[in-house]
């Protein structure tokens, strides 16, 4: 069996990991063994949090809509129910944006939701 030398592949793999670990503190950006662990863990966190981000933003939108709806004497759940009955299909992201930046338009939506209930 012929001898196999793998120095080139190992060097390339190490360089790739160390490049990904650029900006990390101390040994995490300089030592392959430590950098590999740091990069792997960072990848796990990134994967998990890309999914978690969707939940977090939905919670934020609901909190903003609820706060704006309560300023107009209506709860979040009754507001959403009223919009559904009024056949107004605006997603929570846009509703939250309207609630923050256009109070008059949001108040009009609340009135339409109240009328539909």
From Swiss-Prot:
Q: Answer yes or no on keyword RNA-binding.
A: yes
Record's superkingdom?
Bacteria
Q: Which GO terms describe its biological process?
A: ribosomal large subunit assembly; translation
Check the record and name the CDD domains matching this protein: Ribosomal_L20
Keyword DNA-binding tagged: no
Q: What Pfam families does UniProt report for this protein, alphabetically?
A: Ribosomal_L20
Alphabetical UniProt keywords: Ribonucleoprotein, Ribosomal protein, RNA-binding, rRNA-binding
Gene Ontology MF terms: rRNA binding; structural constituent of ribosome
GO cellular-component term (any):
ribosome
UniProt xrefs under PROSITE patterns: RIBOSOMAL_L20
Tell me, in a sentence or two, what this protein's role is.
Binds directly to 23S ribosomal RNA and is necessary for the in vitro assembly process of the 50S ribosomal subunit. It is not involved in the protein synthesizing functions of that subunit.
UniProt xrefs under PANTHER family: 39S RIBOSOMAL PROTEIN L20 (PTHR10986)
Q: Which HAMAP family match?
A: Ribosomal_bL20
**Annotated family:** Belongs to the bacterial ribosomal protein bL20 family.
* Protein name according to UniProt: Large ribosomal subunit protein bL20
User: What are the top taxonomic ranks of the organism?
Assistant: Bacteria, Pseudomonadati, Pseudomonadota, Gammaproteobacteria, Vibrionales
Gene that produces this protein: rplT
């Amino acid at each position: 069996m012929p001898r196999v030398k793998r120095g080139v592949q190992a060097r390339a793999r190490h360089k790739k990991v160390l490049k990904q670990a650029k900006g990390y503190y101390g040994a995490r950006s300089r030592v392959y063994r430590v950098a590999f662990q740091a990069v792997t863990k960072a990848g796990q966190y990134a994967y998990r949090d890309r999914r978690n981000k969707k939940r977090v933003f939905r919670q934020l939108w609901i909190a903003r809509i609820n706060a704006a709806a309560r300023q107009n004497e209506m709860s979040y759940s009754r507001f959403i129910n009223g919009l559904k009955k009024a056949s107004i299909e605006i997603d929570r992201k846009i509703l939250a944006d309207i609630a923050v930046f256009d109070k008059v338009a949001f108040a009009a939506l609340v009135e339409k939701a109240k009328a539909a209930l």
